[in-house]
């Protein structure tokens, strides 16, 4: 749902910023 999309985007952003992808 909506919360899943928000969490998914948040994880992608944190992944990109931390470089732990």
From Swiss-Prot:
Family to which the UniProt record says this protein belongs: Belongs to the frog skin active peptide (FSAP) family. Brevinin subfamily.
Protein's cellular compartments: Secreted
Main location: secreted
Species this protein is from: Odorrana jingdongensis
Disulfide linkage: 15-21
Keyword Secreted: yes
Pfam family, one: Antimicrobial22
Tissue-level expression: Expressed by the skin glands.
Name of the protein in its database record: Nigrocin-2JDb
